[in-house]
Amino acid sequence: MRRLLPLLPLALLSACVTAGGQRSAATGAAPSILTMQRLVERLSSDEFEGRAPGTVGEQKTLKLLADEFARLGLKPGNNGSWFQDVPLVEITAKNATPLSFTGGRQPVSAVYGTEMVVGTYRTDGRATAVKDSPVVFVGYGINAPEKGWNDYAGVDVKGKTVVILVNDPDYETRELTGPFNGRAMTYYGRWTYKFEEAARQGAAAAIIVHDTVPAAYGWNVVQSSWTGAQQVADSANANADQSSVIGWISNDKARALMASAGQDLTALSAAAKRPGFKPVDLGVRASVGFDNQVRKHMSKNVVALLPGMTAPDEYVLYTAHWDHLGRCQKAPDGDDICNGAVDNATGTAALVALAEANVKAGPTARSQVFLAVTAEESGLLGAQYYAANPVFPLARTVGGVNMDALSVAGPARNVVVIGKGKSDLDAYLDRALATENRLATTEPTPEKGFYYRSDHFAFARKGVPMLYFEGGDDLVTGGRAAGAAAAKDYEENRYHGPKDEYDASWNWAGVQSDLNLYYRVGRELATTTAWPNWVAGDEFRAIRDRSRAKTR
């Protein structure tokens, strides 16, 4: 999700792609870079309007994928259908008032879009408002009994507004040890968790303080992601158990709020990192209101099956999310389509290219499932729905690979494994890497929490070993400095914005090598009898062991 674009001369690019293809062909067939290019260009064109769920862009995406899988001769995966229904609710906040804080030294007001964003998970369609709600600073908003940590200790926040820091208390440490894994983010650091816990505590409103470093993206990403239509999972109670208001506030406005309350955000943040932190009643009251335009709709996951020959009831899973943001915050040139070329037309196209290569290589012992999921950008909703309602039993799912935002920065000496050391799939990847003369490395920025930000996480939580890697930050041309520069350029100028667009001059050599790796890992999983597992002591090991025990 975070890289772009140093270019190679076309002749060198062609040579690199050809070499990668020849290496992969040793196992049967090379995933086609031409298929990748064709589909990425098409999926990220303005015709698809940014591929937001519940739009014309979704319908065009679904048709394209079903047509591609049918062309290849795959089978519809869901009882004769290419699709799995995913019930969603589209909620668009309208006529938002400023988020105002009163009762302090001076009133503070934050304007929607530029200084704050708000919305709701509640799907009843009623206008949303909190008025004169007492405000409590709850640090990182974490309640983790197993770690002896409770940021809500000693305070009742029912009906109140909680202000929460993003990430978790250890993120600034250099080590990978500590109550929250040191610099490596835990799920307690994700914004999704913050809102989940605030709802469990009964908060009327939950507001996260944006900070670029611990959030891992700038305010521009919050703007483009949180303004406009939002997708929410439907439920029987219309999500009445969720906080009435959720949202973000800019760092500058958060500092102004704290100053008005006689507090200092820097000092409070430092205190929140220490064990025994106690929530702080700020002595101010919050008010905000907005109307909700609600539309229930049935989005869809795409499920394609390549049946196995001798173990057809054992499944290898390939995943990628087809969705992006649709219409979004306008760029200065007036462009308001977030095309999502890298994120994630590349992963979606890779799904088809891998299916194509496996068809050409011939059948495997195990079945292979190619799953394009919806609403990843809204919190992994499509993947979570499949994981809760699997078309193919997760206990019979051997493992899989997830593809999200393939790197077009050029060939790299390494791949960055998100969650390296968690499962036996690392060994499968190492064998594939040897054929590409590349190495697996750990995340350079584990504090950004990439492990919890893509669809593999939904399956890992159910015990299925999933491999997710990025294309590498040690570029053949320019090394790590060039890799870091490409990542910075993408994050700041393209990620979740209108400029994530297809470029005919992209360097596809690294993509070809990455495709070869996905292919080899998936092919080995599909042709052996082994059942990879999580390493001993991993958070998902016991879940996997229990599910496997039921099948024996």
Mark where each language-model region is:
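Catalytic-core environment of secreted peptidases
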Residues: 30-48, 53-76, 100-102, 106, ...
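Soluble metallo-hydrolase cores and metallopeptidase-like ectodomains found primarily
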Residues: 102-107, 115-154, 238-340, 356, ...
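Extracellular/luminal Protease-associated
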Residues: 23-25, 111-245, 307, 336-339, ...
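Extracytoplasmic/secreted proteins, especially bacterial periplasmic and envelope-associated proteins
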Residues: 31, 35-38, 42, 56-68, ...
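Noncatalytic luminal/extracellular "stalk/propeptide" segments of secretory-pathway proteins
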Residues: 49-176, 280-283, 290, 294, ...
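C-terminal motif of bacterial Sec signal peptides marking the signal peptidase cleavage site
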Residues: 14-15
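Metal-dependent peptidase/peptidase-like ectodomains
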Residues: 113-115, 127-128, 153, 159, ...
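His/Asp/Glu-rich mid-to-C-terminal helical/loop segments that flank catalytic regions of hydrolases
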Residues: 356, 360, 476-544
